[in-house]
C-alpha cells in the first residue's frame, strides 16, 4: 500500500487523514485520477481493487517473490489486471537471489541481504513492455516499492518514465547517497518532488524510509 494512505476513500483501510487532514484518498487530494497504473512490487495486491475503481483492468503489477505471487495473484486477476512473477531490474533474464525476511515477507529484497534467499528472474520494464506488447502511453501512474532496488528499476524504465504523470516511490534509506541518486534520477527526467509521506524506521534494516510523491513538470 502507499504510505500516503488509501487511494480511494471508500476503502475500509486507513485513508489519508494522517497525511492530508481528511478522510479522502490520495487521488481526491491530488484532484487527479489515473487512466492506468504500473505497480512494481505487488506484495498482497491491496491496491488492485482501488485501481480497478478508477481505471478498470488497465493496471500492470510485478512481484518478484514467487510465494507472494502465487498467494496473491488472484487479488489482481479478479479485476482482469495483469501480474508478472518477475523482478524489475536494470538487466534482463538474470537469475538472482531475493532475500525474504522470515517475519516480513513484504520486505523481500534483491539488495538488502536479510532473510532466506529464493531465486527470481529479472527483467527491465522496457523489455517487459516490448515482450508483452504493452504501451507506456496507456499508463500515467508509476508506483515502485522494491526495498532498495529503486534505482535499478528506474534505469530499466529509461526515458519511458516521461509517459507518467505521477510517481510514488518508496525510498528505503532516507538521507543516504542512494536516496539522493534516486531523487536526481527522477528529477532529471522532468519531475518535481511534491512531498514525503510520514517517515518510518524499518524493522528489518533499521533504516528510515518513506514514500515520495513526484509530479511531471
Q: Model-derived features: where do they sit?
A:
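Phosphate/nucleotide-binding beta-alpha loop and adjacent structural elements of enzyme active sites
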Residues: 1-217
Amino acid at each position: 500500500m502507499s504510505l500516503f494512505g488509501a487511494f480511494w476513500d471508500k476503502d475500509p483501510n486507513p485513508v489519508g487523514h494522517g497525511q492530508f487532514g481528511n478522510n479522502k484518498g490520495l487521488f481526491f487530494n491530488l484532484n487527479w485520477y489515473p487512466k492506468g497504473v504500473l505497480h512494481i512490487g505487488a506484495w498482497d495486491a491491496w491496491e488492485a481493487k482501488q485501481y480497478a475503481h478508477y481505471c478498470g483492468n488497465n493496471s500492470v503489477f510485478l512481484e518478484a517473490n514467487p510465494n507472494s505471487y502465487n498467494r496473491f495473484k488472484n487479488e489482481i486477476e479478479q479485476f482482469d489486471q495483469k501480474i508478472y512473477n518477475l523482478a524489475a531490474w536494470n538487466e534482463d533474464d538474470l537469475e538472482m537471489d531475493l532475500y525474504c525476511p522470515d517475519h516480513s515477507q513484504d520486505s523481500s529484497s534483491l539488495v538488502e541481504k536479510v532473510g532466506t534467499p529464493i531465486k527470481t528472474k529479472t527483467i527491465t520494464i522496457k523489455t517487459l513492455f516490448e515482450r508483452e506488447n504493452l504501451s507506456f502511453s496507456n499508463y500515467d501512474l508509476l508506483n515502485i516499492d522494491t526495498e532498495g532496488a529503486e534505482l535499478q528499476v528506474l534505469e530499466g524504465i529509461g526515458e519511458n518514465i516521461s509517459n507518467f504523470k505521477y510517481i510514488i516511490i518508496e525510498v528505503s534509506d532516507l538521507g543516504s547517497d542512494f536516496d539522493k541518486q534516486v531523487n536526481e534520477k527522477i528529477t532529471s527526467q522532468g519531475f518535481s518532488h511534491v512531498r514525503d509521506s510520514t517517515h518510518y524506521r524499518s524493522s528489518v534494516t533499521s533504516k528510515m524510509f518513506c514514500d515520495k510523491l513526484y509530479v511531471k513538470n
